[in-house]
From Swiss-Prot:
Record-listed E.C. numbers: 3.1.27.-
Organism listed in the record: Lupinus luteus
Binding residue positions for Ca(2+): 32, 38
Compartmental location: Cytoplasm, Cytosol
Protein name per the record: Protein LlR18A
Coiled coil: none
Gene this protein is translated from: LLR18A
Family, as annotated: Belongs to the BetVI family.
Binding sites annotated in the UniProt record for trans-zeatin 2: 28, 54
Length: 156
């Protein structure tokens, strides 16, 4: 088993607390609205706090698949949110899980900086560049889609 870690940073014009709320507390409602393949997000275990497991269902090219999302830690005061993709058809078979540690920081002009550490836990000793790049692309797409939703809904 190998662990491959990567860091990424993304800026936003949305205020930190508002962006954090959209990316965490309200994401179950927002994500199916802004990411077309995602049909639903449902809690399958837990009460919404650490340890909660969610099933995210998507349809790609007429095929339904899902991933299991486990909330590892949440700290609203420090705007941190850690979770892992722990299973499902949407998790590449070469991976045991993907862990995400995210933090929203104040950015310039009242905006935000989203920092994320991603750890790929592989079954073997190699991480495919394709798997890595797809996960990074999806993460950035999710961030930008939720940011776009907040910007398009000023009363959010």
């Amino acid at each position: 088993m190998g662990i491959f870690a990567f860091e990424n940073e993304q800026s936003s014009t949305v205020a930190p607390a508002k962006l954090y709320k959209a990316l965490t507390k309200d994401s179950d409602e927002i994500v199916p609205k802004v990411i077309e393949p995602i049909q639903s997000v449902e809690i399958v275990e837990g009460n919404g706090g650490p340890g909660t497991i969610k099933k995210i269902i998507a349809i790609h090219d007429g095929h339904t698949s899902f991933v299991l999302h486990k909330l590892d830690a949440i700290d609203e005061a420090n705007l941190t949110y850690n979770y892992s993709i722990i299973g499902g058809e949407g998790l590449d078979e070469s991976l045991e899980k993907i862990s995400y540690e995210s933090k929203i920081l104040p950015g310039p002009d009242g905006g935000s900086i989203g920092k994320i550490n991603v750890k790929f836990h592989t079954k073997g000793d190699v991480l495919s560049e394709t798997v890595r790049d797809q996960a990074k692309f999806k993460g950035l797409g999710l961030f930008k889609a939720i940011e776009g939703y907040v910007l398009a809904h000023p009363d959010y």
